[in-house]
Amino acid sequence: MSKDEIFKENMQSIADFTFSKNVASVFDDMLERCVPLYQEIQRMIVEMAVDFSVDGTNVYDLGCSTGTTLLNLGQNIQSNVKFIGYDYSEEMLAKCKQKLVEHQFPRDYDLICTDLNQGVHIENASVVTMLLTLQFIRPLRRDMLIGNIL
């Protein structure tokens, strides 16, 4: 895992944060250092998803970033499900695909680049996760996104 040093140097001005290639390359380190109990959150998501996943359905990860949650779900869910990861950043999805390939992810999956602010098509879902994603959705669009899930 690459170490996050993106904001180490002094900057004249700070641009808007984006999920760029530089961020994608250190994102896992960023989460480990900046999100208290991140591994425990992952463990709890997997525990609940295992209980709710149903054979023949889809498991969605909205804002899948580098694929950590998808990987953990795929290693623990025993049901015959398809995994679908959505993210707005092509760089994050590239890192996600790389991680799934490196870990020889044996499950059926799709990775889709889309702006969750525009809504998302959810069908035949038994589990939908949105770990640390909703805060990046515009407040006026959150109800619509949640409605797409329900």
Label every PLM stretch briefly:
Residues 73, 148-149:
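Class I S-adenosylmethionine-dependent transferase superfamily signal
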